[in-house]
């Protein structure tokens, strides 16, 4: 994931997404790749994939300290994408 973070900081979002997706594929119960995927997709202005990744992050790690912040990001992205915001309860 460190290589993915490097690519993200350099603005090479496609390479970063490849690395984070690979980490998520091999360790699907690890939360961090899903969060980083969401952030990278968001930087790439890919709202649908960002939302999907953030939701997976919350599914894998529902007790995350930043859960409320991530839920707010999801709602904001859904609003911008013209979707009905999710009705997820706050843990």
Model-assigned labels for residue ranges:
Residues 2, 36, 70-73:
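Canonical tetratricopeptide repeat
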Residues 24-25, 59:
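Conserved structural position within tetratricopeptide repeats
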